[in-house]
Structure formats: structure tokens, C-alpha cells
């Protein structure tokens, strides 16, 4: 059955949506130790498959993208490429969610991370005016209590 109505995605994790080829390239540029010697084996570490056995197995796939997305350029590029991908799939609206506190390992502030996502989203929407994107900032219940209250 074919449905002729606009497509949208209301729950899309930025750090779980990094293109494998971009992750591979950016990890190499940043001298991040890779868990594989080639892109095909690398994909096994970041792509969730149908035989995923637990939420912990699922969440492990987020670690490599998070290691990479610790600077504004990587965050912005990831957001821009995601917008372009969604537009190419025919979506007209999506809400991208992420936790700014998870992008502060190498000195970025939460504000820096938010600005990088907004920059990438705006660049993506400029290239692909058929799609509109909302950004949702999440607070996490892991780490010190002050991490979500920190003023940037």
C-alpha cells in the first residue's frame, strides 16, 4: 500500500545518526583509535543490526560517534549531513535530539555544542529547503547532578 502524505521523524538521535563513512573519516582526522582496520568492519561498531540483543548493546553504538563529536566542526558536519540525508529520503520535517553535556569531553561548553548543531542544521536546510528541522536538547540523568544545571 502506498501512502501519499509527508514523511517526518519526531525522535531522531544526532549521535546515533552519524554517517559511517563520515565517522570513519573524522575519526582518522582526529587521531581517534579505531576499533577496525577498514570501513566495513568499522560499521559493525556503530550500526545497530536487527539481532541487537539488549539496550546496552544498542547504546554501545553511540560511543564512537560521541568520541568523534567533541568539537564544533564534527558536530556541525554531522548535523548538516543528517539534514541532507533526511531530505534525500523525502522527509519534510524532523526533530533531532541530542544531549549537549555529552559533547564537552574536550573543552566545548554545552552552549558551544548547541550552537554547532544549530549551525549544521541551518546549513543543511539552506542546501535542502524542502525540509524543516527542530532541535531538542536533552538532559541526561548520568554523571554529576550539576552537569545539567551548568551555566554556559
What spans do the regions from the language model cover?
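Metal-cofactor-binding active-site regions of metalloenzymes
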Residues: 1-152
